[in-house]
A protein has these predicted regions:
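Peripheral, non-catalytic segments flanking oxidoreductase cores
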Residues: 1-279
């Protein structure tokens, strides 16, 4: 069957139940009427558009150990893929470096998204079956408390030049490493989710919504109850070959948080960073 990703009104009385249901069934949910200021999102996008078009972006090359800073075009590949993704991006942490041209609005958005994510984690915790919630080493909301690795990734997918490696796309099929991803609407279409029939489905780009998906760490902590669903970003049609910008917030537990008998959050993160070429 195809995925039935629910669109949920953040303010509805049964929003928590519907959100958990959608995440359980599909690994994704769409939230409307959320508390994030739409003008703020647009202003942050504009600041980063200016950053990526400047030569000074190279003054902030990423730190391989800390993983903050600027990751140039063709740096990252999906797990199991040899082709590099057609994107450049910047990693924002609470403690990390920020470009001089970027004002305080980015960090304000970071904190607003983190607050929403904390609420969403409490919704999952509340509605998880007892046999699932008892698997969590600590409550989900507590996993990210004072985490140093909650990451806002600002992504720029440049227009295609026509000289790209064969079969390379903006973001190859992958699953997210982290616990939960909160994604404000991208500036252009392109995000797709793989359904149970191995068909790719477009995800909404409604600028008044945020898209949520569960990652590998939630999948592991719940013993596969919450799926980490495969998704990708496809290349644009020739008539819409323009830049695309995206801002996912990746919620990461603290390093010492136990996911299952084989992994802590820290050990799994390091393993995956090596697999995708960032270590």
């Amino acid at each position: 069957m195809s995925l039935d990703i629910l669109t949920i009104n953040y303010n509805d009385s049964d929003a928590d139940r519907l959100f958990e249901k959608s995440l359980k069934n599909t690994g994704f949910a769409v939230i409307k009427n959320h508390p994030i200021d739409k003008d703020l999102i647009g202003e942050v996008y504009k600041e980063w558009e200016n950053y990526f078009s400047s030569e000074s972006k190279n003054d902030y090359i990423f730190d391989e150990i800390k993983q903050d800073g600027y990751f140039p075009y063709l740096t990252e590949n999906a797990k199991g893929s040899t082709a590099k993704d057609l994107k450049e991006f910047y990693h924002i942490y609470e403690w990390g470096r920020k470009p001089h041209m970027i004002g305080p609005k980015t960090m304000f958005l970071y904190r607003e998204l983190t607050n929403v994510a904390s609420t969403l984690l409490s919704w999952i915790q509340k509605n998880s079956p007892e046999n699932v919630s008892k698997l969590f080493s600590v409550p989900l909301k507590d996993m990210i408390y004072k985490s140093q690795y909650n990451l806002l990734r600002i992504i720029h997918y440049p227009p295609l030049s026509g000289n790209e490696e064969l079969n390379s796309i903006r973001a190859a099929a992958h699953e997210d490493i982290n616990l939960l991803t909160v994604l404000v609407a991208g500036s252009q279409p392109g995000l797709q989710v793989l359904d149970n029939n191995e068909s790719w489905l477009d995800v909404t780009t409604d600028k008044n919504t945020i898209v949520i998906n569960s990652g590998d760490m939630l999948n592991m902590a719940s013993d596969n109850y919450y799926p980490s669903t495969t998704h990708r970003v496809i290349n644009p049609d020739p008539h819409s070959n323009v830049s695309r910008y995206s801002m996912p917030l990746f919620l990461h537990p603290r390093d010492e948080v136990v996911l299952n008998e084989n992994y802590t959050a820290g050990s799994y993160l390091q393993e995956r960073l090596e697999e995708i070429g960032l270590k």
